């Protein structure tokens, strides 16, 4: 703990009153004109860094005369040792060894109160205080009106209806719109003068008065253009209303702005802060009487094991901040609660629980009695749900539960790799022929399989991610161009070609096939790029039309496996890898309707 200079007796009394009975307090009485005082000063600083559960103070004898008189100081330096507000020892002169011996004699590494935090624990716990104000701003009626004004009218109308509403459907559409049309991810800026993308990390800057007042910016990242030395600023705004204007940021800005949109649609939410550097939301589903995980960055919901099982993170503390409560929700997002207890070593558990209880009480000021009872019942149900879900997860198994959980998708690949959030090496593949879901309803002789590049989902499980149903995949990525409002699959950066294939198990259909119709949208070639898609059945192969029309295969005989392969190659220059694409589609599509970027339709004979 750094050395603190005390300037008056009331200030010293305040420190003594707040100190734990076991806490050692050492006061260095000095004068600026005293040579030995200057000599011992850096050593005193070293002691303060070494002994965390002690308070090191300095008193200038020419300034704080009231303190000097209390302790009858007549020579400098003099060191007074206090414990439980009483003087327990004293050292006169700049005697390093004597000071060290007295510290060791009286020092206690832990507080007398088992629930009182040590200095290192206090430093760790400080991070949880700053988030408590975030959800309170969501209750501002002006902010909520601003939020509704930027959202699609149709979505607002569905959410604000007086009758029953499908909260999950509203959430899903809100996530999709927010991710694909409204908010953008900030990695590094592009220079407004020479259009060169900055390749270096930002420097820490100081927010201007305007950035602090209008946007609540607590810090600023400053970037210098590699080409023309232009300075670019990225203020880290905390005001969600300001984020409605800027519409860019990283996970903190995403979750903060999204939290305001949720409040504007009368969806009760929490702001979830994770000590391993991620932020997301939770929404209380009234129809299901439970809290639901929602991550606007990833455009996903109700997948709480995404971070541990998908990204490969080791979570420690996930704290949920509502407008009137603060709770620990870590158990919802982990695989093994017993293991978590052994890994939490930053703060003792009783200290953490005591701290969180006080923080929750402060957040709950002004609660009505009915609201207190409501939250108490919810919390009991939530804890029971977490325990039941963990037991259910273990029955399913670690491998199987990760079938539709991949690595992080927001941010550059380099950035995600540095953070260790890519998940398992390479995307997860089905790596076996697709067994089409059996038909339902009156169309018993018709099967359909499709992929939507906008939502990056398939029509049957495993649904999430373009690789989830692929048989083979090499050097292919999904790209969202927010500036052009387009999304597609293309090669990864470099010269190597890209390939992706899907195999369909036709033998398992157990019926003769009348015809197969295959359609692949958005096959695009630019400059010298090459894009080709072929379908192979038995001993023959056919090219898929590039104009989005269907390839129809009539009355296939003895069909067992249908193989569809897309190959991407060619291109030149820095963006050559993007000059061959499949599924190229405009992002701006309202209403959350699915698009058929890729479809396979099969009619069977009666």
From Swiss-Prot:
Names of required cofactors: Zn(2+)
GO molecular function terms noted in the UniProt entry: metal ion binding; peptide-N4-(N-acetyl-beta-glucosaminyl)asparagine amidase activity; protein-disulfide reductase [NAD(P)H] activity; protein-disulfide reductase activity
Listed GO CC annotations: cytoplasm; cytosol; endoplasmic reticulum; nucleus
CC cofactor note: Binds 1 zinc ion per subunit.
InterPro entries in the record: Galactose-bd-like_sf (IPR008979), Papain-like_cys_pep_sf (IPR038765), PAW_sf (IPR038680), Peptide_N_glycanase_PAW_dom (IPR006588), PNGase (IPR050883), Thioredoxin-like_sf (IPR036249), Thioredoxin_CS (IPR017937), Thioredoxin_domain (IPR013766)
Family: Belongs to the transglutaminase-like superfamily. PNGase family.
UniProt protein name: Peptide-N(4)-(N-acetyl-beta-glucosaminyl)asparagine amidase
Species name: Caenorhabditis elegans
């Amino acid at each position: 703990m750094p050395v603190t200079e005390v300037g008056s007796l009331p200030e010293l009394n305040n420190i003594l009153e707040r100190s734990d009975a076991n806490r050692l307090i050492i006061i260095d009485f000095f004068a600026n004109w005293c040579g030995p005082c200057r000599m011992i000063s850096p050593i005193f600083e070293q002691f303060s860094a070494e002994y965390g559960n002690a308070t090191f103070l300095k008193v200038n004898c020419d300034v704080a005369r009231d303190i000097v008189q209390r302790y009858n100081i007549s020579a400098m330096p003099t060191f007074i040792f206090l414990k439980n507000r009483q003087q327990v020892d004293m050292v006169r002169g700049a005697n390093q060894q004597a000071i060290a011996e007295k510290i060791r004699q009286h020092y206690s590494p832990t507080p007398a109160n088992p629930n009182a935090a040590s200095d290192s624990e206090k430093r760790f716990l400080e991070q949880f205080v700053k988030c408590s104000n975030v959800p309170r701003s969501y209750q501002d009626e002006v902010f909520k009106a601003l939020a509704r004004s930027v959202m699609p009218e149709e979505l607002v109308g569905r959410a604000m209806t007086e009758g029953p509403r499908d909260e999950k459907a509203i959430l899903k559409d809100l996530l999709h719109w927010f991710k694909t049309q409204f908010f953008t991810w900030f990695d590094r800026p592009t220079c407004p003068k020479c259009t060169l993308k900055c390749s270096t990390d930002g420097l820490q800057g100081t927010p201007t008065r305007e950035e602090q007042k209008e946007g609540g910016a607590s810090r600023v990242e400053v970037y210098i253009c590699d080409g023309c030395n232009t300075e670019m600023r990225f203020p880290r705004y905390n005001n969600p209303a300001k984020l409605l204007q800027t519409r860019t940021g990283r996970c903190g800005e995403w979750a903060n702005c999204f939290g305001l949109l949720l409040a504007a649609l009368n969806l009760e939410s929490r702001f979830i802060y994770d000590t391993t550097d991620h932020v997301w939301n939770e929404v209380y589903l009234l129809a299901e009487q439970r809290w639901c995980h929602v991550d606007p960055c990833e455009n996903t919901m109700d997948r709480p094991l995404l971070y541990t099982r998908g990204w490969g993170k080791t979570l420690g503390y996930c704290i949920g901040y509502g407008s009137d409560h603060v709770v620990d929700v870590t158990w919802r997002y982990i695989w093994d609660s017993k293991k978590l207890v052994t890994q939490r070593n930053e703060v003792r558990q009783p200290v953490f629980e005591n701290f969180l209880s006080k923080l929750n009480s402060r957040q709950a000021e002004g609660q009505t009695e009915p609201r207190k009872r409501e939250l108490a019942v919810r919390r009991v149900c939530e804890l029971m749900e977490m325990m039941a879900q963990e037991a259910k997860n273990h029955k399913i198994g670690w491998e199987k539960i990760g079938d539709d959980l991949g690595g992080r998708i927001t941010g550059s690949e380099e950035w995600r790799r540095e953070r260790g959030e890519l998940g398992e090496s390479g995307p997860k593949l089905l790596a076996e022929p697709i067994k089409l879901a059996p038909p339902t309803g009156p169309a018993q002789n018709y099967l359909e399989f499709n992929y939507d590049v906008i939502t990056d989902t398939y029509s049957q499980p495993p649904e999430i991610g373009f690789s989830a149903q692929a048989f083979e995949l090499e050097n292919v990525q999904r790209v969202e161009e927010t500036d052009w409002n387009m999304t597609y699959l293309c090669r990864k950066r470099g010269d190597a070609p890209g390939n992706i294939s899907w195999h369909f198990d036709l033998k398992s259909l157990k019926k003769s096939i009348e015809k197969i119709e295959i359609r692949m949208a958005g096959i695009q070639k630019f400059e010298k790029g090459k894009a080709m898609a072929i379908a192979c059945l038995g001993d023959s192969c056919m090219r898929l039309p590039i104009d989005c029309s269907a390839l129809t295969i009539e009355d296939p005989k003895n069909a067992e496996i249908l193989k569809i392969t897309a190959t991407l190659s060619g291109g030149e220059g820095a963006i050559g890898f993007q000059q061959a694409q499949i599924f190229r589609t405009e992002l701006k599509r309202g209403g959350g309707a699915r698009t058929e970027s890729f479809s396979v339709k099969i009619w069977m004979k009666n």
